[in-house]
Amino acid sequence: KKNLWKGSPFKSLTKGKASSGGRNNLGRITSRARGSGHKKRYRVIDFFRKKYDMKAKVERIEHDPNRTSYIALLKYEDNSRNYIICPQNLKIGDDVISGKNKEIKIGNCMPLKDIPPGTQVHNVELVDGNGGKLARSAGASVTLSGFDGDYAIIKLSSGESRKVRANCKATIGTVSNSDQKNIKIGKAGRNRWKGRRPLVRGVAKN
């Protein structure tokens, strides 16, 4: 945590994010006790990792107010930049790459068929090319159990086993900030910063 970037996010990879206040498109409350909270800018995360066979260096690791995990800013060989979900033990200055038959190294992204069984992975696609959907929150990972024909069998943290196409991509490692579950809110005001308003129990109402 001491190595987290203290400055502003990389501006071209952010966009505005309006608070819904728990309202839907009709202006009706659909999620109670939501509203106010600190203003946030959305960080555009690359869940696809489509810059194949191009090395990227980890430029910095940042806090993201929109998710529980940390995010890493990558600088590619063509000087373009992208944010990715930061895996545990990824350090500033590390090299990562995306593509087929790459080294089994934290932060590298490749199809499941190129990963040995028993490996912990995160940001796993459910449909090839649709971007990572599984295991994206702090401390999350899934285990590659084995293969069945054109399918890979993955075991989720819930204990459920799922089959996905072996061509689907995943990133090696576990998601960072696994201590997030131990955070003590400490005071009501901290929940207000997060946009959570007091929730009245139904039994306490008239």
Task: Name what the model sees in each region.
Residues 66, 74-76:
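Structural recognition of beta-strand segments within beta-rich domains
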Residues 1-67, 88-206:
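Basic, glycine/proline-rich low-complexity segments that contact nucleic acids
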Residues 76-79, 157-158:
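Short acidic-glycine loop/turn motifs at beta-strand connectors
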